[in-house]
A protein has these predicted regions:
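A basic, amphipathic helix-loop patch mediating RNA/tRNA/ribosome contacts
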Residues: 1-48, 87
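Conserved class I S-adenosyl-L-methionine
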Residues: 83-94
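Residues at the N-terminus of the alpha-helix immediately C-terminal to the conserved SAM/SAH-binding loop
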Residues: 94, 98-99, 116
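Conserved S-adenosyl-L-methionine
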Residues: 101-109
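S-adenosyl-L-methionine
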Residues: 108-164
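A short glycine-rich, Lys/Arg-flanked "PGG" loop and its adjoining helix->strand segment in the class I
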Residues: 163-180
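Short, glycine-/aromatic-enriched active-site segment of Class I SAM-dependent methyltransferases
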Residues: 185-201
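Core SAM-dependent methyltransferase catalytic element
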Residues: 231-247
Length: 247
């Protein structure tokens, strides 16, 4: 059995960082994974034979910003998926990685909705363009809390199927509207879920994506494309963006 040592020390021994201080900074930013799972703290003890990865530094308040920025770059030649000048709805906003990217890409306003409290990064709370709606499940959000109906929606939720999240989102959106939502197969797979919640089977990934695409289409939205997220989720699961619009 492999020995276990502190992750910050192991990162330096592997040559991934020059110092433990650098390693600790990267861990705090959520940029280090061990066996495909994001490392939570520098003192965490890891097997010496673990597969370690350190993502490049990013300028966002969370890894979510990396995901959405890459997705928007993928669709950079499709004006439907350009948030510039649009009223956006960020479902599952959390720290605000998606919201931050939307603002950077020119969004006029962002309604950041999350079931938690106090998660939105302080730098975003100060932005006049952001309306933070905390402690609110999107399924029971009163439309009156939105001064304008959104025409650009992004979704990053966990522990719930998109089949439960999207119908209320569709009801809130104006027409035309545009959607980028993260499909997380581990929350769509049901009994097909992989070991310890990690879904590795590409066939299960494909089935989950196909099911969500069919669901979105059945609600009158046109699916443009499904593309893999540029990075995995924090638990090591593969994720996929579904892009769709309603006109």
């Amino acid at each position: 059995m492999a020995c276990r040592i502190r992750i910050d020390r192991l990162l330096v021994e592997r040559g991934l960082f020059e110092s433990r201080a650098q390693a600790q900074t990267a861990i705090a930013a959520g940029r280090v994974t061990a066996d495909e799972v994001v490392v939570a703290k520098p003192s965490q003890e890891i097997a010496t034979d673990a597969v370690l990865r350190a993502e490049p530094a990013h300028p966002y308040v969370s890894r979510g910003g990396v995901k959405l920025a890459a997705a928007l770059d993928h669709f950079r030649f499709d004006p439907r998926f350009d948030p510039c000048g649009r009223v956006c709805l960020d479902v599952g906003a959390s720290t605000g990685g998606f919201s931050e990217v939307l603002l950077a890409r020119g969004a006029r306003r962002v309604y950041a909705v999350d079931v938690g409290r106090g998660q939105l990064h302080p730098s975003l709370r100060e932005r006049a363009e952001i309306v933070s709606i905390e402690a609110t499940d999107i399924r029971v959000l009163d439309p009156a809390r939105l001064a304008e109906r959104p025409d650009f929606i992004v979704v990053d939720t966990s522990f719930i199927s998109l089949k439960l999240v999207l119908p209320p989102v569709f009801a809130l959106a104006r027409t035309p509207a545009h959607l980028l939502a993260l499909i997380k197969p581990q929350f769509e797979a049901g009994r097909r879920r992989g070991k310890k919640g990690i879904v590795r089977d590409p066939l299960v990934h494909a089935a989950a994506c196909d099911e969500i695409a069919a669901f979105v289409s059945s609600h009158g939205w046109r699916v443009a494309e499904i593309v893999p997220s540029s990075i995995t989720g924090g638990d090591g699961n593969r994720e996929f963006f579904i892009a769709a619009d309603r006109s």
